[in-house]
Amino acid sequence: MGEWKSVQVGELGKIITGKTPKTSISDNYGGHIPFLTPSDDMSVKYVRKTAKTLTEKGLSEVKNAILPANSVCVSCIGSDLGKVVITTRSTITNQQINSIVVDEERFDISFVYYAMRILGKKLNFISKTSTAVPIVNKSSFSSYEIKCPSLKEQEQIAVVLSALDEKIAINRTINDNLAA
């Protein structure tokens, strides 16, 4: 195993904070573009469906906040602080989520996901000590540090952790079927 280096979250790729189109305009909603919010299921690795969707009109209001597939999204406010998912297609998030469009030449997407899960747990723990609603803004989020090995080691670690996640998902499905 090689040396692990400290890397700021902002160095992992482009950081994008989500935006919400005007909710008073109903034509902004109900289209085919996923609109991820912390109330969506962020307990899974990949977000495949969102409760809300945007139309092309809604997208035009927040066009500079569109995320490509394989972006790592981190909820950065309130009781949902620290939840993490990866997008599976172009997605918009609301302003409660900071996302990383990972620099794939230097970092493995799945490794970044797992690193953000660890950071998310730390953020959530810290938030429990505050009486105010905890918020992690884009600049604070970008300045947090994580440890990263070489890209090759990141890929190896991600393969092992992903296999474990798949096994856990299979076991949950089996348990759900047995309980039914």
Question: What are these language model-derived features?
Answer:
Residues 110-140:
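Short, positively charged
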Residues 47, 54, 84-86, 123, ...:
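Short clusters of hydrophobic/aromatic residues that line enzyme substrate/ligand-binding pockets
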Residues 6-26, 39-69:
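Sequence-specific dsDNA recognition surfaces
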Residues 22-30, 127-129:
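Short coil/turn segments at secondary-structure boundaries
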Residues 37-39, 51-119:
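A short beta-sheet element
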Residues 5, 32-34:
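A generic secondary-structure signal marking the coil-to-beta-strand transition
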Residues 1-20, 143-158, 162-180:
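Non-catalytic DNA-recognition/assembly elements of restriction-modification systems
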Residues 2, 77, 91-98, 129-158:
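A short glycine-rich beta-alpha junction/loop motif
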